[in-house]
């Protein structure tokens, strides 16, 4: 599975110096499953049809936390296919179950890790559906969730139902109609990389 451009911008801006995150590991985004426990676990669900893009932010934008972050993308059961957007949860039950399993794996495998999470477009529905299903103990380990182009924004009334609103940051661009409960894609839906810096600062601020 691969991380999106937005996930890479977040992960590298928030947590890494140029040599801290191996290029292959970032591209595959499988460090929770295959790697050692880290102080922070970052779980991200990409947008529909989104391929992995190995893009790093400028070094001056980084807030370095060398070697302290495990980056994990949701997949392969989450296929990021277009038809799943039209399902009742705006993504597939398999995708939700997979993301739920990743949160639970992080909490069980790495009991001392602090979990941060994010999603873009259909990936926001994956985050919404999975986090709602978590036990209160696992939810408590999630320090912050950033959602970009939240496809469940209208349905969930600007939150993840049953999850602490103070731990949720929603980015909905002006003119992005998916945030209004439709599946109409406009140019505004592709502008969220510009919010990566602000989202990074917010996520880092939620850590203990």
Curated annotation (Swiss-Prot):
Which protein are we looking at? Probable cutinase 1
Question: Is the keyword Nucleotide-binding assigned to this protein?
Answer: no
Signal peptide, first to last residue: 1-16
> Which GO biological-process labels does this protein carry?
antibiotic biosynthetic process; carbohydrate catabolic process; monocarboxylic acid biosynthetic process
**Disulfide bond entries:** 37-110, 172-179
Q: Which InterPro entries match?
A: AB_hydrolase_fold, Cutinase/axe, CUTINASE_2, Cutinase_monf
Does the record bear Metal-binding in its keywords?
Answer: no
Q: What is its EC number?
A: 3.1.1.74
Q: How is it modified after translation?
A: The 2 disulfide bonds play a critical role in holding the catalytic residues in juxta-position; reduction of the disulfide bridges results in the complete inactivation of the enzyme.
Query: A Pfam family matched by this chain, by name?
Result: Cutinase
Superkingdom is Eukaryota
Q: Which organism is it from?
A: Penicillium rubens (strain ATCC 28089 / DSM 1075 / NRRL 1951 / Wisconsin 54-1255) (Penicillium chrysogenum)
Q: What role is this protein assigned?
A: Catalyzes the hydrolysis of complex carboxylic polyesters found in the cell wall of plants. Degrades cutin, a macromolecule that forms the structure of the plant cuticle.
